[in-house]
Amino acid sequence: SSAASDVYKRQHVFRGNDHIFEEMEGLRFKVGPKSFYQTNSEQAYNLYKVARDFAGLTGDELVYDLYTGTGTIANFVSRQARKVIGIEYVPEAIEDAKVNAEINGIENTLFFAGDMKDILTQDFINQYGRPDVIITDPPRAGMHQDVVDVILFAEPKRIVYVSCNPATQARDLQLLDVKYRVKAVQPVDMFPHTHHVENVVLLELK
């Protein structure tokens, strides 16, 4: 609703800072009130380690990090990649992603803010390069068909699909099946004593 939207836009700090910092493997991540960050910090580290292991980076890869949020995964894997491009819908999150790269001395990341299906196009791929690896961590609704189509066009060697909704993840995997096979699956219990789970899937080009 417009009322809820107005509340979201209004922001007032009554005391203290307007952000917090999370740390992971010596990296510091600034997180603001409008930015997405995993609520279970300890398990978030395990989740991102699984994603990084599945990516199989050697230092030569161009990586696309879709739905990058505050750039946590992008910056986390940047030391093992040649370059990482992160895309996220929320502009404030992308500003935090850029700050996070700067405060950690990371110079091989590039971030874009906007609707995924509008930014990630064939023209974008042609301009910035075909990714060797795509890491995608979409919201519960999963990926838009247009995004899936561009991923299939780009044909990265590996896709690491992180999901908080196995149902929409399964739907998207079915769409990717025309060119990709599932090589590994690793659930991560982000929310103990609930039915929710984060699921990480590694896909490789057939």
Residue ranges of each PLM-predicted region?
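Blade-terminus and WD-like Trp-Asp/Gly-His loop motifs, strongest in beta-propeller folds
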Residues: S1-S2
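Rossmann-like S-adenosyl-L-methionine
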Residues: S5-K206
